[in-house]
Amino acid sequence: MPKTILVVDDEPSILRLVRATLEPKGYNVITVDNGMEAISTAKVKQPDLILLDIMMPKMDGNEVRHKLAEDPRTKDIPVAHLSAVGDFNQQLEAYDEGAIDYITKPFAPQDLRQHVADLLDPLKREEMKRERAKKSGKVRTIVEIMRRTDSK
């Protein structure tokens, strides 16, 4: 049975690109363009993975992730962010609040396929969580050094 991936982005071109990248590899790709639809679709379809944009109108990806985490029907679905914002603080916040991965746009199709394959593999996902914890510590150190430097 093919794995189902819910892709949430307000940019139609990103939705088309992700679908064109993943469907040929056998994934069932469901696309929606807003946060409310993402939540209702996740409850009904129970995808194996959610790829979630952060900057969307009405309800941003962070709020969507929080609502998914609060619902017993969706709290265990892994969420990876797709974002054009590569800001350290935003990545750190996403990781701290439960995002399993943070994929920056633009991305190469082969990189997205590899991220998805890793995220759908339970052993690799656990390894990614450990790496994320290490990375969060390093990012915190970098951000703190930058703050100290800026304040001088």
Feature roles, as predicted:
Residues 45-51:
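Active-site beta3 strand of CheY-like receiver
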Residues 56:
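Receiver (REC) domain active-site loop signature in two-component systems and cognate sites
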